[in-house]
């Protein structure tokens, strides 16, 4: 209930805080951290206190393996760490970092979008290099098979 109340309070603030940002539009971004292979944190210093000045961006259209305690097996955890390391490596090697905003994810805590590194889609890189599968909200296939 508290999460729902917080979400109801935060969404109007977000809508008012950045009236220039529209879905499907590309913006320069400061990537603050890699959360996992398909999710990054970006600086959002425009968010009012007490909110964290960071938004989580989940790369739309892909699923990478989970890492750590969220993984269903040791193999998935290892692949999840590899996907995260790959994402970190691509970000570190890029000079131009941008995001393409799309929508809120189905849980409301992250923004769906794509990350462009030197103009190249992180989504495409993850899939092309075997670190992710295409995913559009359907039931996920296990990484442990």
Which sequence ranges carry the predicted segments?
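Sec-dependent signal peptide recognition
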Residues: 2-8
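Small beta-barrel nucleic-acid-binding modules, primarily SNase/OB-fold domains
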Residues: 5, 15-145
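N-terminal signal peptide c-region/cleavage motif recognized by signal peptidases
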Residues: 10-14
